[in-house]
Amino acid sequence: MKTRDMNRDWIATAETLSSALPYLQRYDDAIVVIKLGGHAMGSDEGMESFARDVVLLRQVGVNPVIVHGGGPMINALLDKLQIKSEFVNGKRVTDAATMEVVEMVLSGMVNKRIVQAINAQGGKGIGLSGKDANLITCEATDPALGFVGTPSEVNADMLKNLFEKEFIPVIAPIGSGTAGETFNINGDTAAGAVAAALKADRLLLLTDVAGVKNAEGVVVTELKAADVEEMTAAGVIAGGMIPKTETALAAVRGGVRACTIVDGRVPNAVLLELFTDHGAGSMIRS
C-alpha cells in the first residue's frame, strides 16, 4: 500500500496550475513572438529552461515563434578574426566581411543551438533565416550602416503553415534584398516585423535587463506609447533600450496587442509573463 503526505509544495503547485487556467484559455491558439537576445541566452541550463517553456507553450495550444539575436557570439568571432565593429544607435555597422561572420554565427551556430534545445525537450523546432522562402525581405536601412536591413515584407503565410504542423519556427534575423543582397537585421526589429505581420497576440523581447526604468531607476511595469515617447525625448530611455522600445511601438501600432520587454535571466520568465498576474518586465500598449 502506498501512502503520501500532502505537503505545502504540492498544494502550492496545484494552486499555481489552477490560477493559470484563465490565462491558458486566453492564449489558446494565440500567436506569441519571442525575441531571445544573445545576452539572455546564458548557460546551457538557462537554454534548457527556455526551451522547456517554449515547448510547454506549444503543448497548451500557443503558437510560439522565436526570433533570436547573437551579439555576444558575433563579437567574440569578430574579435577572434580581428574584424572591428562599430555601432550607431544600437545598430551594428555591417560591411561585407562582417556580414559573412554575422550570417555564419546567427544562421549556423546560434540558430541550431536553440533548435536543438527545443527538440531535446520534445518540441518540433525548425531553424530558418529570413532568406528562406523570402521569409523577410529587406531594404537598406542607411548607407552609413552598410548591409543593415529594415524589413519591408514578411511571408506570414509560411509561418502559419508551420503552425498547422505544430512546428516551432526559430528565425535568424538575416534578410534578403530585392537585388539578392544579404542584410543583417537588428533582432528586435526583425521580431517586431514578424509579430506585426502575424498580428501576434503578444511580442516578448527577452533581454538581460529588468525592463524599462524611469528616471529614478525603477522598472515601469506598464507604459503607453505616449509614455515611451516622453521618456525617450527626455533621455531616460537611451542606448540599447531605444531599438527595443522603437520595436515595441511599431509592433503595437502594427496590430500586436501588447509588447513586453522581459528579463530573460529570470527562470521561467516567459511563463511568468503570460500565465500569471505578476508578469516579468515592462508591458507597452498603444
Curated annotation (Swiss-Prot):
Q: Which residues bind substrate?
A: G70, G71, R92, N184
Please give the pathway this protein is involved in. Amino-acid biosynthesis; L-arginine biosynthesis; N(2)-acetyl-L-ornithine from L-glutamate: step 2/4
Which CDD domains is this protein grouped with? AAK_NAGK-C
Q: Which UniProt keywords apply?
A: Amino-acid biosynthesis, Arginine biosynthesis, ATP-binding, Cytoplasm, Kinase, Nucleotide-binding, Transferase
Upper classification of the organism: Bacteria, Pseudomonadati, Pseudomonadota, Alphaproteobacteria, Rhodobacterales
Q: What does this protein do?
A: Catalyzes the ATP-dependent phosphorylation of N-acetyl-L-glutamate.
Q: Which Pfam families match?
A: AA_kinase
Name under which the protein is recorded = Acetylglutamate kinase
